[in-house]
């Protein structure tokens, strides 16, 4: 939950940039004048369902230009499907209730495949003779294979087991290297930008007690 907290709040300046637009107007405009009218028509109906269910009043339906709501920036359909009434007041209120917002974010991450207790990002050391074509999120191998290729954990040992991971190099071969585990996919599903997802995942590891990652040393080791 601590990792999710930063992912949620850091995405929008800790809730400072949630938007100030009436999402009914935003979604109605996008449903009429957009390259994805079917998508936004469904989101407009999702916004109506939120009000019908009693979660928010029409004047509280404030978000960004794309119709995303509150500090979590959920689409209305996500809000309706994954919203959680964590504070027990009888309605899902991600606008005013921090417990509801955080629990809903965790619920959405779970839908993206998040597995509690499993790793998401681990700093590693990569040998110079590494088959670099195997790096990238599109390539997944068991940790045992990464170990055979000479990849080692930056701290501790890298188990030679069957847990799949991808090698990502955010700053290229000469920068820090990481194994991204299946839980990292949940960050990518939330925001497909690798820089954003890696940063959020990194701060998540820091909140979980991990030391700072290295900055690279100018050459593979």
What function would you assign to each model-found segment?
Residues 1-164, 175-178, 188-214:
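Catalytic glycan-binding domains that act on GlcNAc-containing polysaccharides
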Residues 168-170:
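Alpha-helical and coiled-coil interaction segments, frequently adjacent to or embedded
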Residues 181:
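Acidic/histidine-rich, surface-exposed loop or edge segments in extracytoplasmic proteins
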Residues 215-221:
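Solvent-exposed beta-strand motifs enriched in subsets of small alpha/beta binding domains
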């Amino acid at each position: 939950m601590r990792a999710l907290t930063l992912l949620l709040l850091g995405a929008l300046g800790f809730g400072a940039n949630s938007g100030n637009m009436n999402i009914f107007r935003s979604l109605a405009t996008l449903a009429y004048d957009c390259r994805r009218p079917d998508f936004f028509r469904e989101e407009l109906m999702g916004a109506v369902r939120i009000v019908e269910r009693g979660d928010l009043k029409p004047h509280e339906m404030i978000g960004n230009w794309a119709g995303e709501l509150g500090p979590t920036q959920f689409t209305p359909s996500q809000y309706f499907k994954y919203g959680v009434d964590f504070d027990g007041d009888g309605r899902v209120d991600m606008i005013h209730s921090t417990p509801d917002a955080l629990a809903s974010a965790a619920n959405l991450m779970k839908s993206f495949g998040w597995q509690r207790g499993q790793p998401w990002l681990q700093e590693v050391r990569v040998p110079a003779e590494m088959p670099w074509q195997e790096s990238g999120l599109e390539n997944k191998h068991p940790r045992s294979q990464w170990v055979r290729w000479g990849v080692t954990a930056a701290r501790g040992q890298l188990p030679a087991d069957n847990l799949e991971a991808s090698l990502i190099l955010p700053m290229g071969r000469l920068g820090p290297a990481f194994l991204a585990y299946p839980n990292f996919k949940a960050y990518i599903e939330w925001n497909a930008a690798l820089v954003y997802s890696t940063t959020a995942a990194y701060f998540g590891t820091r909140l979980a007690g991990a030391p700072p990652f290295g900055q690279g040393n100018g050459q593979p080791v």
